A protein has these predicted regions:
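Secondary-structure boundary motif
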Residues: 1-4, 29
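Helical cap/lid subdomain of alpha/beta-hydrolase-fold lipid enzymes
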Residues: 24-184
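Alpha/beta-hydrolase fold nucleophile elbow
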Residues: 3-13
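Gly/Ala-rich beta-loop-alpha elbow adjacent to hydrolase catalytic centers
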Residues: 12, 16, 20, 47
Length: 184
């Protein structure tokens, strides 16, 4: 389908959402300028680990260079409207007793490395607090796992896609957290 605005919605899962934040920037990265904000008007980040106590060097660099929703309308500066991007963060909130054995085994260490709390809430890999980027429209989906190996419903399950896609169709009203009901 042709986009009526000439721009696209970028969707990144896990670290892909963090890397797409870097793609939006027009500053050089490893000798190349991407300026993805000229092509996209929305960035959806699914279970993306934006913050962590033990973050990789690349993730730390993205957070230092492009803190929060850097190109959003909420940034109070003189950026031209063409450079503005809507950020939507989607976090799963998985009940670990109902999750896969892999999620039950990995989640405590992953959560501790990210937030410092092994009993945090999250999608089995990324805590909710890490997945919700400051300044973004935030969607928390109960019962949603990081990937298919973590639970039956994950960000790419058709019923779950419908849930987070609906957030894109709502008018942006600020840095809202939208908690959806359990995904069937």
């Amino acid at each position: 389908r042709h986009s009526p605005t000439g721009q696209v919605t970028l969707i990144g899962h896990s670290s892909g959402g963090v890397m797409l934040r870097l793609f939006l920037d027009d500053a050089p990265f490893q000798g190349r300028c991407y300026d993805g904000k000229a092509l996209a008007d929305t960035l959806v980040m699914l279970g993306s680990p934006h913050t962590a106590l033990r973050a990789t060097a690349l993730r730390q660099m993205v957070q230092q260079r492009l803190p929060g929703s850097f190109f959003s309308d909420r940034v109070g500066d003189d950026r031209v409207k063409a450079d503005r991007v809507r950020y939507v963060s989607v976090a799963g909130d998985l009940e670990l007793p109902a999750a896969s054995s892999m999620a039950r085994r990995l989640a405590p260490t992953a959560y501790r490395n990210s937030s410092g709390d092994a009993n945090d809430r999250g999608d089995g890999l990324v805590p909710v607090t890490s997945a919700l980027l400051e300044g973004s429209t935030s969607v928390v989906l109960p019962g949603v796992a990081h990937g298919g190996a973590f639970g039956a419903n994950w960000y790419g399950t058709p019923a779950v896609v419908v849930e987070w896609w609906c957030a894109l169709e709502q008018p942006e009203t600020g840095a809202d957290t939208v908690a959806k009901g359990p995904v069937a």
